[in-house]
């Protein structure tokens, strides 16, 4: 048998000589591959252990153990590399130190952990929009001497800025901090040169401490040490004194904000050297003097807001050199003169507000044709004269316009219909004519939501249905005010078509007739003022079916858009500064004082649970004060004075805990004045003219006046008294019956016992 046969007999197959080296090579390569895999695995473990610096890791774990969040807790897993934890960034060094912590909007609360100070390589720390509290620790920058960005805004930090004493390593090199944002906290005290972030900082580019309670003078020394500063924000604090000279050293400054403080004096001249300035925000202070002509040097200025100060003088004639201006707000000052013609060169203006100054001139002569981007125009409360400025129709982007409280004459131009985006129009307190023509034109403004035209059209007749033929006019009107004009006629029925109406003011006119019940059908109406008219008849029950006043849910369904201009619903409110920037800020109320209404107050009034104000004074209302008024749990003001109301003041009104004003002067009320709750705070004068009232805050005792004829008491109170009498009699009768039964049973058994 051959060798090949022997191999086959044993079950083997002979391989060729060429296959044996290949198999050996394959086994060798597999071995090498396994060694590589093992090496990579060991290397990855070693690298993994080396990625996270152990000291930094312990500091972070200490950090997470000292802050909490019920909304978004820190789920840092101690078993994995800390460089992979959420919000953590490490450098590429062999030790892999922590260089950044970014955990905004996590609802973290607790003290700012001191363990952060051990992260000596930290360059960025962002813990903004949380609930951290406590003081900033002393030595903050000395420990974190690599920190470049610090954002602790929107927290609850308090106390003063600590004084920085020494550097961590004893060297004299400066801190590299570049961005500091401590806004929206509760920090206080003065910002001194030795304060943290001030001593040894030479690279600051942004410093924001707005919305705190800092006091003293606005610091300017950082402009000397950090000339690269581009943003300074000191607004919404309690800084006092003058704006210091020295801010002009910040030649790179693009944003300077110090509004809403108590600073005074003039704007320093070196401010006008800031050629890079884009925003100058100094409103709501006590600044005086005039706006210097040198302000035209700030050619990069986009926003100039100096409103609510005591500035005088005229607007610089060359204001048009500020061609990049987008917002010019100089309202509520004492600025005089005319609007410079060069203002037309500010073609990028989006918002122009010069309200409440002493400006004059003819508005119709102003060139509005170049303001193609203008969205908000407010020239109210000045002394502008002439016809309605028809050229304003060139401002195609205009959405809000106010010329109220000026001396405008003539009629509203049909060109206003070209302002397709117009949503707010305030023309109150002028000398405009032809209300029928005005409303006929304005009903075509499809986007108009607020129309204030009161104190115009004196002694004209309110247009009737036949005068306004459009069936779909004012489709989006929410606020309509035409009070103070002495308008004649009746409340027009065409108003019922305004289904979006939420606020209506027809006060201070000469309207006659009755109050239509359909006023109660508006789904969103929550504010009605019909005061000081000649309206007669009774209060319609349907008026108290207003859905928006019957439930909080329906009231909340009313659109709550932010108004682009503050609204003075009644033109008389301008002097008392009762302005509203949001529709729902108006107190839900019904004002019908000083009319000729008679009859009783409908009990349906108790359905208006959202009502805050009810004024029915100076009418001829009679009957009782309905106890259903106690269901108005949101009521703050109730004025029923100067009517013919009788009976008692319902004791149930003491449950109205929000009621801060109550007046029933000059009625025919009797009985005791309720005590307790808010009734202990109302002055005695609010009850005068009711000789039969007693008790409470009055000196008159109720001993001689508690027994009053039933006709002078409230029906509800009488029913309560009758019910009490019935219960008393029933109780006495029951007692006699039980006693008799007991007596009979006892003596019956006694007789039986004796007989035995």
From Swiss-Prot:
- One of the GO biological process terms: response to fungus
Q: Name one Pfam family in it.
A: LRRNT_2
For the region N-cap, what residue ranges are annotated? Answer: 51-88
A cellular component annotation (GO) from this entry: plasma membrane
Tissue spec. comment: Expressed at very low levels in the shoot apex.
Phenotype upon knockout is: Normal resistance to F.oxysporum (f.) matthioli in cv. Columbia. The double mutant rfo1 rfo2 is strongly susceptible to F.oxysporum.
- Would you identify the family this protein belongs to, as annotated? Belongs to the RLP family.
What's this chain's function? Involved in the perception of CLV3 and CLV3-like peptides, that act as extracellular signals regulating meristems maintenance. Contributes, with WAKL22/RFO1, to resistance to F.oxysporum (f.) matthioli in cv. Columbia relative to cv. Ty-0.
Q: What is this protein called?
A: Receptor-like protein 3
- Species assigned in the record: Arabidopsis thaliana (Mouse-ear cress)
Q: Quick one: which gene encodes this?
A: RLP3
């Amino acid at each position: 048998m051959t060798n090949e046969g022997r191999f086959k007999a044993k079950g083997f197959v002979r391989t060729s000589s060429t296959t044996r080296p290949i198999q050996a090579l394959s086994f060798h390569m597999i071995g090498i591959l396994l060694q590589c895999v093992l090496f990579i695995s060991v290397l990855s473990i070693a690298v993994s252990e080396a990625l996270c610096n152990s000291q930094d890791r312990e500091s972070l774990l200490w950090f997470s153990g000292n802050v909490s969040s019920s909304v978004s807790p820190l789920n840092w897993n101690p078993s994995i590399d800390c460089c992979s934890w959420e919000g953590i960034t490490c450098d590429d060094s062999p030790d892999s130190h922590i260089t950044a912590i970014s955990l905004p909007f996590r609802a973290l609360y607790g003290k700012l952990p001191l363990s952060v100070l051990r992260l000596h390589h930290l360059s960025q720390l962002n813990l903004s929009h949380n609930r951290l509290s406590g003081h900033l620790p002393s030595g903050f920058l000395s420990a974190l001497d690599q920190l470049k960005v610090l954002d602790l805004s929107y927290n609850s930090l308090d106390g003063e800025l600590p004084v920085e004493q020494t550097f961590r390593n004893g060297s004299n090199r400066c801190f590299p901090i570049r961005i500091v944002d401590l806004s929206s906290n509760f920090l206080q005290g003065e910002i001194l040169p030795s304060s943290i972030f001030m001593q040894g900082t030479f690279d600051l580019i942004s410093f924001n401490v707005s919305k705190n309670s800092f006091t003293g003078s606005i610091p300017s020394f950082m402009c000397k040490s950090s000339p690269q500063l581009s943003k300074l924000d000191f607004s919404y604090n309690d800084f006092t004194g003058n704006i210091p000279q020295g801010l002009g050293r910040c030649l790179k400054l693009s944003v300077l904000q110090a509004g809403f403080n108590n600073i005074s004096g003039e704007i320093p001249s070196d401010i006008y050297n800031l050629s890079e300035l884009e925003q100058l925000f100094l409103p709501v202070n006590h600044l005086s003097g005039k706006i210097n002509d040198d302000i035209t040097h700030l050619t990069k200025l986009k926003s100039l807001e100096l409103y609510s100060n005591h500035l005088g003088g005229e607007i610089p004639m060359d204001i048009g050199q500020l061609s990049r201006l987008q917002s010019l707000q100089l309202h509520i000052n004492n600025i005089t003169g005319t609007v410079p013609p060069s203002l037309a060169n500010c073609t990028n203006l989006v918002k122009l507000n010069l309200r409440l100054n002493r400006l004059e001139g003819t508005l119709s002569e102003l060139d509005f044709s170049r303001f193609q981007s203008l969205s908000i125009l407010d020239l109210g409360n000045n002394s502008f004269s002439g016809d309605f400025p028809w050229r304003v129709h060139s401002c195609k982007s205009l959405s809000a316009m106010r010329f109220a409280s000026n001396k405008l004459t003539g009629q509203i131009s049909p060109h206003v219909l070209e302002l397709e985006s117009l949503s707010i129009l305030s023309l109150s307190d002028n000398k405009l004519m032809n209300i029928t023509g005005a409303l006929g034109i304005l009903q075509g403004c499809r986007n108009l939501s607020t129309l204030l035209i009161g104190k115009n059209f004196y002694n004209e007749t309110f247009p009737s249905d036949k005068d306004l033929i459009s069936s779909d006019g004012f489709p989006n009107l929410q606020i309509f005010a035409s009070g103070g004009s002495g308008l004649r006629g009746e409340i027009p029925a065409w108003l019922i078509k305004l289904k979006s109406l939420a606020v209506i003011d027809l006060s201070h006119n000469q309207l006659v007739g009755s109050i239509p019940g359909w006023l109660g059908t508006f789904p969103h109406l929550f504010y009605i003022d019909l005061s000081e008219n000649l309206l007669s008849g009774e209060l319609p029950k349907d008026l108290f079916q207003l859905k928006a006043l019957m439930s909080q849910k329906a009231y909340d369904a009313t659109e709550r858009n932010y108004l682009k201009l503050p609204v003075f619903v009644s033109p008389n409110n301008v002097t008392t500064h009762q302005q509203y920037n949001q529709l729902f800020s108006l107190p839900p109320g019904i004002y019908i004082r000083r009319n000729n209404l008679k009859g009783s107050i409908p009990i349906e009034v108790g359905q208006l649970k959202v009502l805050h104000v009810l004024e029915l004074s100076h009418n001829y209302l009679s009957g009782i004060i309905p106890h259903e008024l106690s269901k108005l749990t949101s009521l703050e003001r109730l004025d029923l004075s100067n009517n013919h109301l009788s009976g008692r003041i319902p004791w149930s009104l003491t449950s109205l805990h929000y009621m801060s004003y109550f007046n029933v002067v000059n009625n025919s009320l009797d009985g005791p004045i309720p005590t307790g709750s808010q009734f202990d705070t109302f002055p005695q004068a609010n009850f005068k003219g009711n000789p039969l009232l007693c008790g409470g805050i009055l000196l008159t005792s109720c001993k001689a006046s508690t027994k009053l004829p039933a006709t002078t008491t409230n029906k509800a109170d009488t029913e309560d008294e009758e019910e009490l009498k019935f219960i008393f009699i029933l109780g006495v009768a029951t007692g006699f019956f039980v006693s008799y039964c007991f007596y009979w049973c006892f003596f019956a058994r006694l007789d039986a016992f004796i007989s035995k």
